[in-house]
A protein has these predicted regions:
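A short, flexible loop at the N-terminus of ABC-type nucleotide-binding domains that lies
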Residues: 2-6, 15-28, 59-65, 81-85, ...
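Short catalytic/signature loops enriched in Gly
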Residues: 4-5, 144, 238-329
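P-loop NTP-binding/switch modules centered on Walker-like glycine-rich loops
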Residues: 58, 179-183, 187-268
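Conserved ABC transporter NBD signature motif
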Residues: 66-77
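Conserved ABC ATPase "signature" region
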Residues: 76-77, 128-148, 257
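ABC ATPase NBD coupling module
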Residues: 78-95, 121, 243-248, 278-284
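A short, proline-enriched helix->beta-strand linker immediately N-terminal to the Walker B motif
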Residues: 172-176
């Protein structure tokens, strides 16, 4: 792995096996996350971004299975370690904030029970020390009356408070990598801004890397250093955040940005991407985006493009850039 690389994903393939056959949810995904870097993975629902994060966490369960590729984290190959070794990593060096905090927290146990368990699992401390560390973490994420919240049940807290609890749990053991899967879903814009500000602050303090899974381009612009755009289980574009927003290369990325509401475009018709993401049964033979692409050619219909490098340093899976330097790996 390159110097400074914390997470390296190479040609990851995660399939789900159904009565009608194997469904490739993630198909040949490759990317890296460096120490202290925030990488955003964006795309429509069903593009494979959440399955990618679950694959990294070792949480893909039957009928799903990782059938190919390599995941390396901090020098270790995760695709070959045992579940017992994975449990030592999860919540410790490798943490995740899930989409919905209400369903991610156990309603039968107090916040203190659940937060304390994470600390006791990974640190050599007493129950009292774990309690004090838990209360300290709740205060750190901006929760008032932390002692009272520690004794509370999830249903007694608001959505924003529950999400802060999830962040406290994820960061309790100072992980090297935090995977945040739609961390601000279903939160109002004020709470969303507070959560994003909180994540930036805590990550800066601990030099934690973030893999941010989202469909919200506003969150991406605010948080990310690097952006990965996924479509139908593949990476279709990768670039630094400034390049991607200034000069999007792939027609799908261009469509995503064009369909984002703009407060300065009053009275203008909101653009959209025609069509829908293909299913396993309707997956095109060539480029997966060609049925929805305004620039599609005959080559796009019959040949699947590789990931190529543009003159601006972006990596893009599109025949419009054929002849440019091909992306390595």
């Amino acid at each position: 792995m390159k110097k400074g690389t914390l997470l390296s994903v190479r040609e990851l393939k995660t399939y789900f096996y159904t009565d009608s056959g194997a469904v490739p949810s993630v198909n040949g995904v490759s990317f890296e996350v460096k120490h202290g870097e925030t990488v955003a993975v964006v795309g429509e629902s069903g593009c494979g971004k959440s399955v990618t994060s679950l694959s990294i966490m070792g949480l893909v369960r039957s009928p799903g299975k990782i059938i190919g590729g390599d995941i390396r984290f901090n020098g270790r190959t995760l695709t070959t370690i045992s579940e017992r070794e994975y449990r030592k990593l999860r919540g410790n060096e490798l943490s995740m904030i899930f989409q919905e905090p209400l369903t991610s927290l156990n309603p039968l146990f107090t916040i203190g029970n659940q937060l304390g368990e994470v600390i006791l699992q990974h640190q050599q401390v007493t129950k009292e020390e774990a309690k004090q560390k838990g209360i300290e973490m709740l205060k750190k994420v901006g929760i008032p009356r932390a002692e009272q919240v520690y004794r509370s049940y999830p249903h007694q807290l608001s959505g924003g408070m529950r999400q802060r609890v999830m962040i406290a749990m994820a960061l309790a053991c100072e992980p090297k990598l935090l995977i945040a899967d739609e961390p601000t879903t279903a939160l109002d814009v004020t709470i969303q801004a507070q959560i994003l500000q909180l994540m930036r602050k805590l990550v800066k303090e601990n030099d934690t890397a973030i893999l941010l899974i989202t469909h919200d381009l506003g969150v991406v612009a605010e948080m990310a250093d690097t952006v990965i755009v996924m479509y139908a289980g593949q990476v279709v574009e990768q670039a630094d955040v400034f390049t991607l927003f200034a000069t999007p290369a792939h027609p799908y990325t261009q469509g995503l940005l064009a369909s984002t509401p703009n407060i300065h475009a009053s009275g203008e018709k909101l653009q959209s991407i025609e069509g829908t993401v293909p299913t396993h049964e309707t997956m095109p033979k060539g480029c997966r985006f060609f049925p929805r692409c305004p620039h599609a050619t005959e080559q796009c219909v019959h040949q699947e493009p590789p990931l190529m490098k543009t003159g601006r340093g972006q990596h893009v899976r599109c025949w419009l850039f054929d002849g440019k330097e091909a992306a390595s790996g």
